[in-house]
Amino acid sequence: MTFGVLFDLDQTLVDTSSLKTLRDRRMWRNVPHSLHLTRVCDGAQELIEALQTEGMPLGIVTSAPRMYAEQVIGYHGLNIEVLTAYHDTRAHKPAAAPVLHGMKALNASSGVYIGDAEIDRAAAIAAGLHFLGVPPISPEPLSQMITRIRLLAGEEKS
């Protein structure tokens, strides 16, 4: 049984709050000119590297269009191969469909979804996954999640 880890993108892996106006207005073509205003969230790169070292498959599930997500991921050099974006499913978060799509792409039968919003929590629960929240919905930062993820993965194997 393979345990997968899925992340939300905006405000979970990358602080894209500086792009909010562009995102709200769907000005996707202007995003590349503003990527320098974004930053990887504290602990994100370290968590990704630790999970990859342990052989856990990783993916991103976002409500953003693929073009936008790929630009953000590429700019910051996040080494995550699986991406489920807005147009990959007909239903969107808080529905289970995008999370299930990500799990299928990871070839994982169980896992955890990590996000910053209630729709992330709802999507994880609807998909039958564990959920770990980052601020603002939970005080736990990414840098402190490795132990909890290991415990969840261990529970699924036993």
Sequence positions of predicted segments:
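Short amphipathic alpha-helical segments, especially helix-boundary/capping motifs
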Residues: K20-R26, G43-E46, G74-L78, A97
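Short, conserved structural micro-motifs that define repeat-unit consensus positions
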Residues: P57-L58, G115
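Active-site neighborhood of HAD-like aspartate-dependent phosphohydrolases
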Residues: M1-D42
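Conserved phosphate-coupling serine/threonine residues in phosphotransfer and NTP-handling enzymes
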Residues: T62-A64
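Catalytic-core regions built around general acid/base machinery
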Residues: G43-G55
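Asp-based, Mg2+/Mn2+-dependent phosphohydrolase catalytic module
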Residues: M1-V5, L37-R39, A50-Q52, R66, ...
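A generic structural signal for short coil/turn motifs at secondary-structure boundaries
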Residues: G59-I60, L78
